[in-house]
Amino acid sequence: MKKIKARWVAQSVLGRGLHPKHFLRYLKLSKKKQSNDRHEFDAQLKLYAQILPGDFLHYGYFDQPDVPPERISLHDIQQAQLRYAQLILRQLENRDNEVLDVGCGTGGLINLLIQNGFKVTGLTPDRFQIQYISEKYPPAQLIRAKFQNIDIDSYRKHFGTIINSESLQYIALDKAIAIVKQILKTDGRWIVADYFRTGQSMEKSGHLWDEFHTKIKAAGFNIFHEQEITQNIYPTLAYVHMWGEKLGLPLLEYLVGKFKQKHPRLHYIFNDVLLELHSYLDKKLDLVNPEIFIRDKKYMLITLQLTA
């Protein structure tokens, strides 16, 4: 077998990238890929549904926070996700007006709300999620948009309840509050289940808790219910972190070692890239390190009521 040389790799890539014939082929393959995106997404959802049925995409809620990660099964994760959704469900009362599920994912919470007699509208910018939910949970109304871009005039004072389940962290806080005030009915409920930063950590996902608290009160929201559930989502983080440490990083190190053994010169060329990849995975593992999470963040379930 001919040895692979860096010069040959560069010539081949540039030749295929710049030659008109190959460039046209590239465009055709790109179009084919776009047409296959739907089938790929269906396959991913099917796999996820087989692993964790229920269509939930959140951390879950464990009644026993001290359960060791080695004793947690996929069934336990599934049940924890259902308990989390039921925790949110208990905060709802108004069945006369629509519920808006912001960042509805694949529709697990939508399904639970429909089963309990609520009229639900799901919001997501993802066209595949829209298609999936419309086929699997047809009673749900759907809005394909980012929350920041929702048509306020069409939904002004429309919803009796708005739910942000692990979606508020992706929306600028001032923008979210302003929109909720316009599309939520007076005396309506805004349910937020998400994690918040408790200090100035290097990792910036999640809003600052003190800032959130100050701004919602200034905006005219009363706190109807407030519950910290950090310890109850701890087992999920510990479970994911355990598998990352026991399987993810060792597998990467094994593959890099095999690559170095078979292609030492290529390994030398890509060494900095491989080191950066390892560093990237380390940082991602830190995001689900339960001890770091508890040090820097708190997970809250808070129900707010909009006053006149």
Residues covered by each model-derived region:
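Conserved class I S-adenosyl-L-methionine
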Residues: 96-105
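Substrate-binding/catalytic lobe of Class I Rossmann-like enzymes that use SAM or dcSAM, i.e.
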Residues: 202-291
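A short SAM/SAH-binding and catalytic strip from SAM-dependent methyltransferases
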Residues: 161-173
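Class I SAM-dependent methyltransferase SAM/SAH-binding core
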Residues: 106-150
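A short glycine-rich, Lys/Arg-flanked "PGG" loop and its adjoining helix->strand segment in the class I
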Residues: 175-189
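N-terminal auxiliary segments of SAM/dcSAM-dependent transferases
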Residues: 2-53
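Conserved alpha-helix/loop element of class I SAM-dependent methyltransferases that forms part
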Residues: 78-96
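A short acidic, Gly/Pro-enriched loop at the edge of an enzyme's catalytic core
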Residues: 151-162
